[in-house]
């Protein structure tokens, strides 16, 4: 499933007609029209689970991720861990660059023991990609999280920070190249790298 909003759904429909994929592409319009009424990343996940009546394990890949690594190792490890949730991670060269991301610390079993959202002074160079494997038995925790109005629907990092205190969340460190292309500077750098 690819979730978008009313503003961009027609663009995605045009794209989907010519996209080459071994998987069926299903577009989902979250029915929002602008940033003021958007559901947020966690809200969109909840929306798709409910709308499509999902009852299977879920792989969530944020649309602003661009990476060269394979998902196979991540998925195999997530299923092997039999963990409620696994999260894709990337090790930056410089710790100071982690200020732009969610910063993670792992224990010896690769469980997430610390999560800081965009800290001024990162305690690690290991950062969160917007990449999650959620076991079907724990999809309901998204609803539990969203019931508390203080929790942020637009920040997946806030969900993980909350979730790691509820259940085990494992991290998987990707190798290769990764970009968060959420702004033009990094989008242009990614274009130079991948094109």
Where are these regions (language model features)?
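Catalytic-core segments of class I nucleotidyltransferases/pyrophosphorylases
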Residues: 66, 75-79, 111-195
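Structural beta-sheet core signal
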Residues: 2, 60, 87-88, 171
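A short acidic, often aromatic-flanked loop/helix-cap motif at beta-alpha or helix-coil junctions
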Residues: 32-37, 95, 121, 178-180
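Conserved donor-nucleotide/metal-binding helix-loop-beta segment in metal-dependent transferases, i.e.
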Residues: 69-98
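Conserved N-terminal catalytic core of the sugar/cofactor nucleotidyltransferase
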Residues: 1-60, 66, 73, 183
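Short acidic-glycine loop/turn motifs at beta-strand connectors
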Residues: 105-111
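Short, high-confidence coil segments that cap the C-terminus of an alpha-helix
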Residues: 55, 82-85, 167
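Cofactor-binding loop segments of dinucleotide-utilizing enzymes, especially the Rossmann-like FAD-
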Residues: 5, 63, 90-91, 174
């Amino acid at each position: 499933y690819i979730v978008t909003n009313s503003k961009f759904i027609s663009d995605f429909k045009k794209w989907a007609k010519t996209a080459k994929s071994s998987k069926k592409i299903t577009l989902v319009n979250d029915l929002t029209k602008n940033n003021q009424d958007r559901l947020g990343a966690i809200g969109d996940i909840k929306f798709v689970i409910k709308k499509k009546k999902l009852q299977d394990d879920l792989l969530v890949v944020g649309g602003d991720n661009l990476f060269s690594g394979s998902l196979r190792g991540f998925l195999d490890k997530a299923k092997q861990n039999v963990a409620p949730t696994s999260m894709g991670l990337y090790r930056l060269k410089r710790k100071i660059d982690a200020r732009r991301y969610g910063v993670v610390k792992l224990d010896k079993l690769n469980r997430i023991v610390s999560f800081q959202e965009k800290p001024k002074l990162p305690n690690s160079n290991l950062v969160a990609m917007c990449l999650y494997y959620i076991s079907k038995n724990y999809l309901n925790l998204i609803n539990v999280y969203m019931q508390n109005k203080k929790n942020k629907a637009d920040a997946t990092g806030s969900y993980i920070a909350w979730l790691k205190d509820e259940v085990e969340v494992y991290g998987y460190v990707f190798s290769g190249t990764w970009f968060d292309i959420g702004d033009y500077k990094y989008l242009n750098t990614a274009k130079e790298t991948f094109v």
